[in-house]
């Protein structure tokens, strides 16, 4: 559960992401594909090369979903229900991949905003991404 301080930290951090959410999403995906090559199996039809249009487009979807989640911190299950259905029932993504992408998102955010990425912000973002991952995998059960 996100505390009031966590919610404030997440909103503050995400406000700095702003219009870069899609870029950061794509960068995190590229980082995940490089660091955890088994994640590529869910994207056999994608050109996974650096800067590919498909990775950029999916990165925008990731960024948009996280922006939506930040706007609904008090109702993540409601905000992400359709996305949870998609990943559980249609795409059947291994739940561990959400944790891997979360890690890569944290690294990406830290690289782009090193002065703002304090231990408190890091902890709050980690909790937020963990909550998002939990919601996205909740329908697997």
Swiss-Prot record:
Q: Which residues carry this modification: N6-succinyllysine?
A: 7, 11, 16, 40
Binding locations of O2: 58
> Which organism is this protein's natural source?
Tapirus terrestris
Gene Ontology process terms (BP): hydrogen peroxide catabolic process
Mention one GO molecular function: oxygen carrier activity
The record, for SUPFAM superfamilies, names: Globin-like (SSF46458)
Gene3D superfamilies linked to this entry: Globins (1.10.490.10)
Q: What is this protein called?
A: Hemoglobin subunit alpha-1/2
Task: Show the InterPro entries listed in the entry.
Answer: Globin (IPR000971), Globin-like_sf (IPR009050), Globin/Proto (IPR012292), Hemoglobin_a-typ (IPR002338), Hemoglobin_oxygen_transport (IPR050056), Hemoglobin_pi (IPR002339)
Q: Which residues make up the binding site for heme b? A: 87
For this UniProt record, the keywords arranged alphabetically read as follows: Acetylation, Heme, Iron, Metal-binding, Oxygen transport, Phosphoprotein, Transport
Q: What family does the Swiss-Prot or TrEMBL record give for this protein?
A: Belongs to the globin family.
